Design a protein with these regions (language model features):
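A generic structural signal for short, solvent-exposed coil/turn residues
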Residues: 95, 261-263, 290-292
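Proline/serine/threonine-rich low-complexity linkers at boundaries of modular beta-sandwich domains
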Residues: 252-266
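Contiguous beta-strand segments within globular domains
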Residues: 264-270, 274-290
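Contiguous segments within soluble domain cores/interaction surfaces
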Residues: 289-321
Length: 321
């Protein structure tokens, strides 16, 4: 039987050895064996985040204590730039994550040098998590710099502008300043909304979806502006950025996509059975008569009992027509 893949195993002895080799190639005094031994001690018992932190701690222990010297070494040790959107199988790039965390943990008092390092590292693997402590500490300064990055020729740098400023990035610290004042990042998203790369536009939509969870009116208003401007990719971005509001049945979000108040009659929902066991298939059908020619989006919700005994639901799209 094929062994189950565990995300934590992207951090393994080979990856750590490769990282040590990259460093020693540009910094001959690096204690390779000591670094590897330190990182691998108790490694098997650690989860994904703990392994990443152990690597970062190893860098802190074995690189020069002078931050600027250390970050220069790490910059020179970076591998070749990615040529396009990274695929799901490029696990080797994960070694850069704890390297960028080194900058986030130790370089907050060196804004320019640290941000330049993150600029270079994101061309190899996203710095979306590591940039966030700098944004929290220097919000205006960071946004000013990110405006210039929004027009960078490198697609990964442009994506970082949007992904790094997401208020609710998964696996990253939240940015409450943008939850309270999302207007601060709208100019950045406006610069990226017509980006030639779907990779970037997807990030713009994800950012707007994050904002919609706290400030739905802000998202509706900016999308209305983009709609008036006849933004090239408006339909795609609107559909993806409004997904949370659409699942809530938000009337303004639905209207923005052309789903007005539906006019239907003789609606009939049929469910195959009244009782089900875990693992059974639930089949249902819906019949109705549309009174006029109109756009319709029909969702359905599955209610389930959570571990704490409370009832919750998950919304799924049934059909758009």
């Amino acid at each position: 039987m094929k062994e189950k893949f565990l995300l934590r195993n992207v951090y393994n002895e080979k990856m750590i050895t490769d990282l040590a080799d990259r460093i020693i190639n540009v910094y001959s005094r690096f204690e390779k064996s000591g670094f590897i031994e330190f990182v691998l001690s108790d490694f098997q018992d650690l989860n994904f985040g703990e392994r990443a932190l152990k690597i970062t701690s190893g860098l802190e222990k074995y690189l020069p204590q002078d931050y600027l010297e250390a970050i220069d070494i790490l910059t020179k040790s970076l591998g070749p730039e990615l040529s396009s959107e990274p695929g799901l199988t490029i696990w080797e790039g994960f070694y850069i994550m704890p390297v960028t965390d080194f900058a986030a943990r130790n370089g907050l008092t060196h804004f320019n040098e640290s941000m330049q390092f993150l600029y270079e590292s994101t061309k190899r693997f996203s710095s979306e998590s590591a940039i966030r402590p700098f944004i929290l500490k220097y919000p205006k300064k960071s946004i000013s710099l990110l405006k210039t990055w929004a027009t960078d020729k490198n697609v990964h740098v442009r994506r970082l502008v949007s992904e790094g400023t997401r208020p609710r990035l998964p696996l990253g610290i939240r940015l409450p300043i943008f939850q309270k004042k999302p207007e601060m990042i709208l100019e950045l998203l406006d610069l990226l909304k017509d980006d030639s790369e779907l990779y970037v536009r997807r990030s713009v939509a994800n950012n707007l979806n994050d904002i919609s969870k706290h400030n739905p009116k802000v998202v509706i208003n900016i999308l209305k502006e983009w709609q008036k401007e006849k933004t090239k990719y408006f339909a795609w971005i609107a559909n993806h950025s409004l997904r949370t509001l659409l699942k809530k049945g938000d009337k303004q979000a639905l209207s923005l996509l052309g789903f007005k108040n539906p006019e239907m009659k003789n609606c009939k929902l049929t469910i195959s059975n009244s009782k089900y066991r875990i693992g059974d298939n639930l089949e249902f059908s819906l019949e109705f008569i549309s009174i006029k020619k109109q756009k319709l989006m029909i969702d359905y919700a599955i209610h389930y009992v959570k571990a704490n005994g409370k009832l919750s639901k998950k919304v799924f799209n049934f059909i758009k027509m």
